[in-house]
Regions:
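Bacterial N-terminal signal peptides that target proteins for export
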Residues: 16-29
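Activation targets extended, charge/polar-rich intrinsically disordered C-terminal tails
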Residues: 42-57, 180-444
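Bacterial N-terminal signal peptides
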Residues: 28-39
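Intrinsically disordered, low-complexity N-terminal segments that are enriched in acidic
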Residues: 44-168
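Active-site-proximal structural scaffolding
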Residues: 34, 87, 256-259
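Active-site acidic/histidine clusters and adjacent loop/turn architecture
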Residues: 145-196, 200, 210-214
Length: 444
């Protein structure tokens, strides 16, 4: 299901009971409340230059990283497999973890750190998605960055009947949905002449795997170390365990537990920002729930634009203060890049004029301005420019280094702050040297 709008992505349903209809009307009412509370819906269509990161180079410098992606609605043409109603302009979100792998013999979505050497980590990761179809899991996992985003398409190949079928066949061979059960209400929409397994993979393509076949995406990377990736893996496995054991049944909810809650809270587990609780009272959740495109902007700002030159501002940010004192880490750091990719073209299966909205205040809102800035200023999308920017920021901080005249905890914070900045300055300068060396070798 696509976030925000709550529009289903299954076949047209048979007649429902009065009880089910009333339940759906209540769900619709909750969504209307949310829309009223967040009145501005802006920038529906893809408006960003296509950007790409050199995966081999990036992973050689940052073998462990998380990548949050806000992805558009999809619009499937009729006559190709199951006729799906489609999502809505609120879109969907997915989460890629480089350096984490699916445990292949678990028979259920379970993660572990990859065994690969950090030097061979390019594309070695797992993509996660949340879907309202699921009954016994919160998320599913797709092995490999290339397949998670691009399916089984060859370089330069469009989406056609052959590549569409090939991608589903490969997904089945990988066992992406092994051990996963769908809600009966979803399975009841299955065409009579289709097996449940084929149906599950058909309605999951371009939402839970092979995202680029049908959707535009805007992605934000968060460099991590092995320890932080391990924390995220443990968090995600623990999140799924009650559904795996049968203690709980998963029920997606646009306001209280949508696709973006998973990614937000996984990043909160390592200190990127505050946790966003699930299952809050509806009147509270309706005015504060994650919207995929908003989350993309929020994450890019958190990892690039915190006032790191102002230690007092960092001290007043509780999450940043705790991160720095306990971990020696500031979430705004080098290497946190954005990437924009439109849906694959040519495309015989899906229309590619797609929407993905912000929710924002219509007069005083700033999301559009902030989004535009990300794709105008090279430091957000180009690795060398990003690293040079942080090197300059760190140099300026250290040049003005002055400890406050205090003996309280703020003084301890200041000392830790300058130590961290000095360490990060040395690291980013070393990374720039490695990047320059890599570019020189590539040019030969």
């Amino acid at each position: 299901m696509d976030a925000v709008t709550g529009m289903r992505m299954t076949t047209i349903r048979p007649a429902e009971s009065d009880t089910k209809i009333l339940h759906r009307l209540r769900q619709l009412a909750f969504v209307v409340i949310a829309v009223i509370g967040l009145p501005g819906c802006i920038n529906a269509y893809y408006q960003a230059p296509r950007t790409a990161v050199d995966e081999r180079v990036y992973a050689s410098l940052y073998p462990y990283f998380a990548e949050y992606c806000a992805v558009s609605e999809f619009d499937k043409k009729q006559g190709f497999g199951v006729d799906i109603e489609g999502g809505g302009p609120g879109g969907h979100s997915v989460f890629y973890l480089n350096g984490a792998c699916r445990v292949r013999d678990a028979g259920f979505p379970v993660l572990a750190l990859c065994d690969d050497s950090p030097n061979g980590m390019a594309g070695r990761g797992v993509g996660l998605s949340v879907n309202d179809h699921y009954e016994n899991t919160n998320w599913t996992a797709t092995e490999g960055r290339a397949f998670f985003y691009h399916g089984a398409l060859a370089p330069g190949e469009g989406v056609n009947r052959a590549s569409y079928a090939r991608t589903q066949d490969e997904a089945k061979a990988m066992g992406i949905l092994d051990g996963v059960k769908f809600h009966r209400a979803t399975l009841d929409t299955k065409p009579a002449d289709m097996s449940e397994r084929d149906f599950m993979y058909e309605v999951s393509i371009a939402t839970d795997y092979a995202i680029d076949l049908a959707r535009d995406r805007f992605c934000a990377r968060v460099p991590l170390d092995r320890g932080k990736m391990e924390i995220i893996v443990r968090y995600l496995n623990a999140l799924n365990e009650p559904y795996r054991s049968g203690q709980k049944e998963f029920h997606w909810n646009v306001l209280r537990e949508n696709c973006a809650h998973l990614e937000h809270n996984a990043l909160a587990a390592v200190g990127v920002w505050r946790e966003l609780p699930i299952d809050r009272p509806l009147l509270i959740a309706a005015f504060d729930f994650p919207v995929p495109k908003n989350e993309f902007v929020n994450l890019m700002r958190r990892t690039n634009d915190m006032p790191i030159a102002d230690p007092d501002a960092l001290y007043d940010d509780e999450v940043a203060r705790v991160d720095l004192l306990r971990q020696g880490w500031i979430a705004t750091e080098p290497g946190a890049l954005a990437e924009a990719r439109p849906a694959v073209q040519p495309n015989d299966i899906y229309n590619t004029h797609l929407r993905l909205i912000f929710y924002d205040e219509p007069v005083f809102g700033h999301y559009q301005q902030r989004f535009d800035r990300i794709f105008v200023e090279p430091r957000y999308t180009d690795l060398a420019t990003n690293l040079a920017h942080f090197s300059q920021v760190y140099t300026a901080i250290l040049a003005k280094r002055q400890m406050p005249d205090t003996t309280d905890r703020r003084g301890d914070f200041y000392q830790r702050y300058f130590d961290v900045v000095a360490r990060e300055k040395a690291k980013v300068d070393a990374t720039l040297v490695r990047l320059s060396s890599s570019a020189s070798w590539s040019a030969l």
